Amino acid sequence: MVFAFWKVFLILSCLAGQVSVVQVTIPDGFVNVTVGSNVTLICIYTTTVASREQLSIQWSFFHKKEMEPISIYFSQGGQAVAIGQFKDRITGSNDPGNASITISHMQPADSGIYICDVNNPPDFLGQNQGILNVSVLVKPSKPLCSVQGRPETGHTISLSCLSALGTPSPVYYWHKLEGRDIVPVKENFNPTTGILVIGNLTNFEQGYYQCTAINRLGNSSCEIDLTSSHPEVGIIVGALIGSLVGAAIIISVVCFARNKAKAKAKERNSKTIAELEPMTKINPRGESEAMPREDATQLEVTLPSSIHETGPDTIQEPDYEPKPTQEPAPEPAPGSEPMAVPDLDIELELEPETQSELEPEPEPEPESEPGVVVEPLSEDEKGVVKA
């Protein structure tokens, strides 16, 4: 009986010695590490092959956002290399049977699944792979508080609170600030989403609210003002609008007055030019031209030589300048000598429509002075004068 037992034991031992097996052990499959710190991922292995020349160790990383794992560390024959985002951050163990690695300066993006693979040909059987789930813990970042709806009495509003970072996911709590006291809100809210709904805002519910995001690493908070009335804001806005309207009115009045002044000045200049136009058309030859040249009549007056000799009994009369008319000269008294009178060329500028000859109206004959005889020109003399 005892002989038979030892016989079976020897047979099983021989069979086990002929099978090559690699066994990988992971002491802790869940690892939590705070952001910025170092973490050691423990992976222990055993192999039935004494030689380590063909031994290879590989670590892979599977991010939750990635579809396939990526290789981050590989070691074989004493040579190790880190790859990708973990380059220069991974240090591997050189101890036999220890495939652990240490990652420095962990970041939120390093959270995910890590896979340890150990191979030592000809050991191909057994459990040569281990899996670790690593979470990088992050304190909640300062949440963003916002309000949807009009924060006025009688309106329905909702308050939201959300932190962009935080591992594990934070939970949210709402409180109302009453002076120095922090009072939990009476309304129901969702601690997972951080949404607080106020169905009918009253004066009692108006004020300042605080939201706090909490996880195992810490907490952060934000505040929001639900004061519906802000008189100072209304005054500022009203003053600003009034200033803009007043400036616009002033600019309009100034522009209108300027344009009106320009129009009056332009009208005044045009009237002045119209009044000065007739003056600019005066004949440069002087006032001696009063009639057209073709209507000019030359008169010859003969005065006695005794006109220059005035006796003591002669009464001097004012000089008389004959008018430039075409009436015939009065007949001289008999016995007087004719006196030559300077020829007078009289021209009159007539309108185009009145170019026809005008018949001179007879004027009363001036009283002849004593001793002065004016004889009319004969037809022959008139012809000579006209020639």
UniProtKB/Swiss-Prot annotation:
Q: Does the keyword Nucleus apply?
A: no
Give the sugar-modified residues.
32, 38, 133, 200, 219
Q: How is it modified after translation?
A: Highly N-glycosylated. Appears not to contain significant amounts of O-linked carbohydrates or sialic acid in its sugar moieties.
Q: Name one GO biological process term.
A: maintenance of gastrointestinal epithelium
**Localization (cell):** Membrane
* Regions of compositional bias (Basic and acidic residues) in chain numbering: 284-296
* Bilayer topology annotation: Single-pass type I membrane protein
Q: Where are stretches of biased composition, namely Polar residues?
A: 299-308
InterPro entries in the cross-refs: Ig-like_dom, Ig-like_dom_sf, Ig-like_fold, Ig_sub, Ig_sub2, Ig_V-set, Myelin_P0-rel, VSIG1
Cytoplasmic compartment: which residues?
254-387
- For this protein, the parts annotated as crossing the membrane are 233-253
- The positions making up the signal sequence are 1-21
Stretches assigned to the Ig-like V-type domain: 22-132
Pfam families noted in UniProt: Ig_3, V-set
The superkingdom of the source organism is Eukaryota
Residue span, Ig-like C2-type domain: 140-227
Recorded protein name is V-set and immunoglobulin domain-containing protein 1
Look up and give the organism this protein is from: Homo sapiens
Gene from which this protein is expressed: VSIG1
